[in-house]
């Protein structure tokens, strides 16, 4: 499910797969060939979240903003494992 928050709606590349039970909220950008698994929650209510190319967000993952990094970025070809919680961080090369 895609939700607009604060006037910003998720942007999803047409080649990405988003499970019907996943929730993307606010300023989320999902790149090419990404996978968002069942019951994942990606909540960009405080700042932007960017999933670069071929990122896999597995079942039950929570990613949200609100910390030191102004933009949460998950770099190309990173897999976030089942049930992980990512709070306001950059994952992968800088």
Predicted segments, located by residue:
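Left-handed beta-helix
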Residues: 14, 19-20, 25-26, 31-32, ...
């Amino acid at each position: 499910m895609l939700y607009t928050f604060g006037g910003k709606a998720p942007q999803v590349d047409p080649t990405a797969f988003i499970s019907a039970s996943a929730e993307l909220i606010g300023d989320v950008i999902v790149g090419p060939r990404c996978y968002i698994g069942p019951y994942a929650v990606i909540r960009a209510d405080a700042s932007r979240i960017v999933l670069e190319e071929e990122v896999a967000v597995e079942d039950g993952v929570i990613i949200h903003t609100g910390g030191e990094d102004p933009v949460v970025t998950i770099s190309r070809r990173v897999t976030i494992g089942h049930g992980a919680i990512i709070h306001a961080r950059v994952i992968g090369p800088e």
